[in-house]
């Protein structure tokens, strides 16, 4: 848990913001088991909907999915920038301070999302339950890059 790591690294006060109630309860139990209840306060709710008792020096964020803006991080970071961070334009106020998504055209003939395999008789092409995002690893030897990667998006947390 990031809050426990921050407290063990020397943070004097940590606000662990968690929107999921059962996860927040488990976080509180983990904090208590670690003996850090005097340093870490688990705040239940979306960071965009809660008010912290004070502005913070550092945001240690896990708001990034497979690509930079997948989990709505841009809105979340902008809100934290305006309401939660003492010095939001400083790079050392954010971990991470920047997130980039890189992409490249590729050929991966073995991936069924790019072309259904002949043996997949049960697949219903119109069914949303069988729609999968295409996530390819450049380390896969069956993947052939068609061009060098290029930056697709960049989210800089220090910019208003």
Give a label for each model feature:
Residues 4-160:
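Class I SAM-binding transferase module
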Residues 1:
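Conserved SAM/SAH-binding loop-helix junction
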